[in-house]
Amino acid sequence: MSKFFIDRPIFAWVIALVIMLVGALSILKLPINQYPSIAPPAIAIAVTYPGASAQTVQDTVVQVIEQQLNGIDNLRYVSSESNSDGSMTITATFEQGTNPDTAQVQVQNKLNLATPLLPQEVQQQGIRVTKAVKNFLLVIGLVSEDGSMTKDDLANYIVSNMQDPISRTAGVGDFQVFGAQYAMRIWLDPAKLNKFQLTPVDVKTAVAAQNVQVSSGQLGGLPALPGTQLNATIIGKTRLQTAEQFESILLKVNKDGSQVRLGDVAQVGLGGENYAVSAQFNGKPASGLAVKLATGANALDTAKALRETIKGLEPFFPPGVKAVFPYDTTPVVTESISGVIHTLIEAVVLVFLVMYLFLQNFRATIITTMTVPVVLLGTFGILAAAGFSINTLTMFAMVLAIGLLVDDAIVVVENVERVMSEEGLPPKEATKRSMEQIQGALVGIALVLSAVLLPMAFFGGSTGVIYRQFSITIVSAMGLSVLVALIFTPALCATMLKPLKKGEHHTAKGGFFGWFNRNFDRSVNGYERSVGTILRNKVPFLLAYALIVVGMIWLFARIPTAFLPEEDQGVLFAQVQTPAGSSAERTQVVVDQMREYLLKDEADTVSSVFTVNGFNFAGRGQSSGMAFIMLKPWDERSKENSVFALAQRAQQHFFTFRDAMVFAFAPPAVLELGNATGFDVFLQDRGGVGHAKLMEARNQFLAKAAQSKILSAVRPNGLNDEPQYQLTIDDERASALGVTIADINNTLSIALGASYVNDFIDRGRVKKVYIQGEPSARMSPEDLQKWYVRNGAGEMVPFSSFAKGEWTYGSPKLSRYNGVEAMEILGAPAPGYSTGEAMAEVERIAGELPSGIGFSWTGMSYEEKLSGSQMPALFALSVLFVFLCLAALYESWSIPIAVVLVVPLGIIGALIATSLRGLSNDVYFLVGLLTTIGLAAKNAILIVEFAKELHEQGRSLYDAAIEACRMRLRPIIMTSLAFILGVVPLTIASGAGAGSQHAIGTGVIGGMISATVLAIFWVPLFFVAVSSLFGSKEPEKDVTPENPRYEAGQ
């Protein structure tokens, strides 16, 4: 094949140009992400039950729906949250690879079976089913710069004017508004109701009857009488639109003709649909809308589309109102991708310099460098065909591939120059002769390297997604590299290399290159003597190898484990929890103190603070608060002002708050898998011991975790039980007084809850009508005495006649996991420990809890547990594939052993480097480790292959091994050094994405240094030992035939 293109160099150029063109066009269309869709698909069900407690929601809604969800295909786990404000969310998480559209249809079908069994109030509110990830993509805020609009005004504007266009934006899965739109609020006065012998039920019935839209028909409608000349629509009664119209609703007509209207017993006016949440931006009145990404959607494209949507709405904002983005996860995506691109460019430059240092021929160096853009651009084309994206993982794989892909071109150029020097052939003929000698080896080495990485592509789960990104990218680059080495590089050699006379070399005799060559030759001589010594003293060095293997196993067991390294995402969360039963006013004081510290004491680090009262990731309620903290750009912050350093300082300050628990934490590396770094676990009531026992177990867990030196910031992702007033109805007494239970329940629901009646029209938009008791009539248990129920005789009976209450405790938020009641606990490893060690400690503590209490990992911890169980199998498969490929390549079962034995020599270096830098055994480390295995095997192949050929030509095992080492040392050092320096930019990276770059770069560099430095001494020993052990026949006398010297620049 190579001969064809050597004779037709323009053909080779055309192929190279087509590959680059296809790749360039693919880059323009490839989506850009920080990560691919690592999180498994999830479908969320959201329901509201107005006025219901968390327990009521769980019993009447959650369990009904959960029971119907059983039997859905590929369902991994189901979690739910029920809140005291009547809201509920069920999240069904599916196996990786499940089509989210299919999953949503299946969930919707199951939900249709459950809907008729749900309370009528829930069905009236509607049930939302969305494909959305768990975390927020960004928060869009509205802030009143001049204070002319209140938070309620801003929230109403968002819901009325912005919510719909935002929800229609491509990529938006779900959203949450921090505030509520206006509603017509009817505030009942119990004293006036009693005066007119009316009840809340009477008011609700009258409003429902008189605030209606009537379809009144037509005059002259078809079929019409002959000769009809008129057709007109009849406009009947319409929905009310103003507070005055509602005040005029007729409630009662007395016998004397006097009338009682709604305005006589209630205050009517526009107010918030609910008052649960309020927000501020840097201390100014604000409201916001948090957007969640649809499953599988592109974060950058969605964020860009949202910004365009807001830009189109801005001209219509009220005066003094400004749109802000107080929380945005996309800047880290562009920054991290940009950083890796810079790393890629730096790697190419460093590889070029190394090649020039060893080849010492500018034309030869240019030829090898020209293969880089062809292969890289071609790889982008393959990524587009495979449906991949440009993301951190594929770009890392590109960086790793650079050192691999130039290696093939180096082998071609180096061998052509050797043939010209030794045989005196012109470049074209020398290239033909050279390709006949090496094209088999090129294909063989590519197969071996592919064999190391291909098993990664077949693993499932979120870890499998990561592995596939690396595997497909590097293997694609390797395949293209071999094709380019067989097609394009020979054509370049035949046309660009200068001819050499027999015995002539390009290597310099004077200057820097002369000094380098002389010193390198001296090193080669010393290296030969060292190898000879090792081969004459096999046993001590084999024992030393055994010690290296033992050390590798010990380090593997000692190095901490993790899923992915932590990253500075440029954002920070702070979560506020005041004592159970605290008011919103009390919580706001703590929120203000937190904001003041961040904006003043951390002004060099913090860009903005968006605070929310009434909500945090643990739950909703007046005792909950939250802050979304945007940090300044990475280039404006030093290492001392990283998100982790800020979190530590902020946490120390928040410990001084006496009236609240405040936690500062950074988001995880993969935002789709949760809201916080560290671990995520559910304690489950698997034995049916009840809520109280589960709460006791949770408190025991938290107490033991607080004493552990391995864990830090361990906290419940829920709310503590708070005071609740248990109202008991004496049914017999109520019946004796002629009061029905239905009237009692309806009166309670309307007076103390917020009862939805129907809708009204406000400035052209449909909004809701709510009836509720006025605040002064529902502040304390004594206020219950102000409310009356009418009995069958028309008499007003006070609640005190048939009801009594007592204080108790109950949870404002209840969670379930896989069908049983559960409590979620979050935490992080203490400084110096990894998430793997923290998870092991959690399992130890959970094992000491009372019987009936189990635990389950979720989110990123679930994925980490899964990835840890896959690692041994992946490692074993990769080594097995290498062995089988080598066996096929050499047609021998014994020779591959000499190559496979080199694997621990690379692993030990990767482990030492990772350990010294305080990093963990995570997914990136494993990818780097497999790459190191492949490169170590490649270096061993270069020695073993030549030693085998020399031995077959009649050399002794000893002489064949030493001669092969001498011939291959220079190219091994050159290609290894090129690869190592190409990865150096990863290890010294800073800014966005630096954590993952360090994780992969450190292990690879450590592994390659040890694989190169140790392997060049041990590989000849392995070759001789294995060949001797398996009965390789020694020649009767040592023959020294003319062997082609495969020396770079010799």
From Swiss-Prot:
Family matches, as Pfam families: ACR_tran
Superkingdom of this protein's organism: Bacteria
GO process terms (BP): response to antibiotic
Membrane topology category: Multi-pass membrane protein
Principal location listed in the UniProt entry: membrane
Induction / repression: The ttgABC operon is repressed by toluene; this is mediated by TtgR. The ttgABC operon is induced in response to chloramphenicol and tetracycline.
UniProt subcellular location: Cell inner membrane
SS bond partners: none
Swiss-Prot/TrEMBL keywords: Antibiotic resistance, Cell inner membrane, Cell membrane, Membrane, Transmembrane, Transmembrane helix, Transport
Segments passing through the bilayer: 10-30, 339-359, 370-390, 393-413, 440-460, 472-492, 539-559, 871-891, 893-913, 923-943, 972-992, 1004-1024
GO MF entries: efflux transmembrane transporter activity; xenobiotic transmembrane transporter activity
Cross-referenced NCBIfam families: 2A0602, RND_permease_1
Family: Belongs to the resistance-nodulation-cell division (RND) (TC 2.A.6) family.
Function: The inner membrane transporter component of a constitutive organic solvent efflux system. Involved in export of toluene, styrene, m-xylene, propylbenzene and ethylbenzene. Also exports AMP and the antibiotics carbenicillin, nalidixic acid, chloramphenicol and tetracycline.
Name of this protein: Toluene efflux pump membrane transporter TtgB
Organism per entry: Pseudomonas putida (strain DOT-T1E)
Taxonomic classification: Bacteria, Pseudomonadati, Pseudomonadota, Gammaproteobacteria, Pseudomonadales
Gene: ttgB
